[in-house]
Amino acid sequence: MGEVKLFFGPNHPGMHGNFSVHMYVEGDTVVKARPLPGFLHRGFEKLMERRLWYQNLALIPRICVPEPDINELCYALAVEKIAKIDVPERAQWIRMIVLELARIANHLWSFSGIGGPIGLYTGSFWGTADRDRILDIFENLTGARVYHMYIVPGGVRKDLTPKIEKMILETLDYIESRLPDYEKLILKNRIVHTRLKGIAKLDRETALEMGVTGVGLRATGVPYDIRKVDPYLFYDKVDFEVPFSTDGDAFARVYLKFREIFQSIKIVKQALEKMPVGKVNTPISEGSALRFRVPKGQAYVHIESTRGEYGYYMVSDGGEKPYRVVVRGASYPQTFIGVEKYLPGTRIEDVPIWLSTMDVCAPEVDR
C-alpha cells in the first residue's frame, strides 16, 4: 500500500492541545512525522512589549493554561532581579506553596490525560475530580481557579489566612490518602503495564540532544531538577528527593509523576511549618503600580515547572514597558523538536501516549 499521510490533530481526541502532527504511516507504523504549530499563536512575547509592566500580569498566566503560576513566578523573578527588589520571606514561602500545589494539580491532571489513550477512564475521572480540590484552594486564595494573577513583582497579592492554611493541610491529607488507590489502579494494573511499559521509550542521549527536561529527562536516568541544581526561593531549606528512573518509557514517566506528588506534599507541609509571620509584598512604586518602571538592565531566570526547565530572558530599557521578553518553554523541546525524532517507529495508537506523558502545552509552544 505504501506511505499514507495522516493528519493527526488539532481536533483529534488523542491530541493534547490545539496543534497538529502530519504523520506518514505504513500500515499502523509511523515512518516520518512533521509538527505543524500555529493554531494557538497569539504572540505573547510581542504583546508583552506593548503593555505596561504591571498589565502583563493578566497576560502571562495564559502562556501555559494548566500551569499559570510558573509564568507568574518567572516574570516576577526577572523583574525583581533587574530592579533589585527584596521580597519578604513570608512571600517567598507562600510562592513555594503555590508552585507545589500547582505541581500536584498538574500531575493529577496528567493521570486524567493518560486515561483516555489507554482506555482507563476511571483514572481520568479520579484525576480531574481530585485536581478540582486544589483549584478550590486557588479560588479561595486568589479569587480565580485557573488564571490566578497572584504572584506579583515584590511578593504575592494576598496573604495566607489560617482558614486557607487549614484547607491546604486537609486537602493534602486527602490526596495523600488517595495515592494508594492511584497506585493500585495505574501502577499495579497489568493492562496498564501492557500499554505503557516499553512504549514511547526515550533514551538518555536523545533526550539530552533535544533539550528535554523535567520528568521526560529524569525518566532516562538523569536526576536533573533546578530546585536542587540551582535552588531558588527556599528550596534549599526544605528536605525533598528527586525521583528518577532509567527505563525511559511511558510507564516510567507516569511513575515519576506519582512519586513527585509525595515530594510536593512533603515540601508544602514543611513550608507551612517554616513560614514566618510578616508582610507578603514589597511596594514596587509610589502611587499607582501602573506607573512602575523597571531600571535599564537584563536578566535570565529559570525554574523547575511540572514540564521541566522554564526560563525568562528579560530586557528593560528603563521605560514603562518591557523592551524584550523571551520565554523558554519547557514543553517545546519534547514536542515540536522531539516529534520528528521519537515518533518514527511508533504505532499510531501509541502516539497519544507519547504526547500525554511528555506533557504537551500547546499555548506555551505557540507563544
Curated annotation (Swiss-Prot):
- Write out the similarity annotation: Belongs to the complex I 49 kDa subunit family.
Enzyme Commission number(s) of this protein: 7.1.1.-
Q: Which cysteine residues pair off into disulfide bonds?
A: none
The protein's job, in short, is: NDH-1 shuttles electrons from NADH, via FMN and iron-sulfur (Fe-S) centers, to quinones in the respiratory chain. The immediate electron acceptor for the enzyme in this species is believed to be ubiquinone. Couples the redox reaction to proton translocation (for every two electrons transferred, four hydrogen ions are translocated across the cytoplasmic membrane), and thus conserves the redox energy in a proton gradient.
Cellular compartments annotated: Cell inner membrane
Name of protein:
NADH-quinone oxidoreductase subunit D
Q: Give an example GO molecular function.
A: NAD binding
Q: How does it sit in the membrane?
A: Peripheral membrane protein
PANTHER family, alphabetized:
NADH DEHYDROGENASE [UBIQUINONE] IRON-SULFUR PROTEIN 2, MITOCHONDRIAL (PTHR11993:SF10), NADH-UBIQUINONE OXIDOREDUCTASE 49 KDA SUBUNIT (PTHR11993)
Q: What class of enzyme is it?
A: translocase
Q: Which SUPFAM superfamilies match?
A: HydB/Nqo4-like
GO CC term (a single one):
plasma membrane
Extract the signal peptide range.
none
Query: Which reaction is catalysed here?
Result: a quinone + NADH + 5 H(+)(in) = a quinol + NAD(+) + 4 H(+)(out)
Where is it mostly found? membrane
Superkingdom assignment:
Bacteria
Provenance organism: Thermosipho melanesiensis (strain DSM 12029 / CIP 104789 / BI429)
